[in-house]
C-alpha cells in the first residue's frame, strides 16, 4: 500500500474521531450541535414571588413532528433571600414567556414558549437551540422544596442555611457552601455533587439518580440515609459518620465498598 494511501486513511480516521469526540463533548455539556439558535439572554429582571412552601419550575412541550427546540444547558442558582420575600431573576426576554400560578402551597413557574412564536428564519429547520441564560431563586426559610423540570437546567445550591429542604429534578445538582440539618434529594440527574458545607442528615433516593460524589475535604456529612432497590456505593474515607440503608423491597440490595471502618445499618 502506498504511503499516500496510509496518509489518506489516517486523515479520514482522525477526522472521524474529531467529529465523534466533538459531538460527545457537546452532548455532555447539554448544548445543541446545530447552528440555529434562539437567544433569550439579556438584561436580568428581578421580581418578588408569593409566599409558598414548594417552587416548581417546568416548561411546556416544545417538540412536534415538524420541529423541536433543544434548551441549551443553563443554571438555576438557589441562594438565600436578603429579605422576607422570595425572589426570582431571569432575562427580560425569558420573562416574556413565563407564567406563574399558585396551587395551594405550591408556586408553579412555567416556561411557555409556543411554537407559534417560532422565528420565521428558522421555519425550515428541524431542530433549533434555545439559550435562556442563567436564572436565580432567592429563598426564605419558608420554602421547603424546589422542583425543576426545565430541560438540562443544572441546580446550584449556594450559601443556603436551612433546617430542611428537598430537591426534585432530573438534572444535575451542585451543593456549595450550604448548611442543612436535613437535605433530601428526591431525584437527581447525571451528576449530584456535594462540594462544600455541612449536612447533618442527607437523604438520597438511589433509584432516581445517576452519579453522586462528595468532596470529603470541604463537605461534612454526619449521617446518610440511602433508599432504593438495588444499588452500589463506595463510602469514602471521612465521607460520613453513619450510613443507613432503607430497602424499598424485601429483596432490595445495597453493595457498599468501604475505605475505612464504618457503621452501615439496615433499617426495616
List each model region and its residues.
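Intrinsically disordered, low-complexity terminal regions
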Residues: 1-168, 172-176, 185-186, 194-195, ...
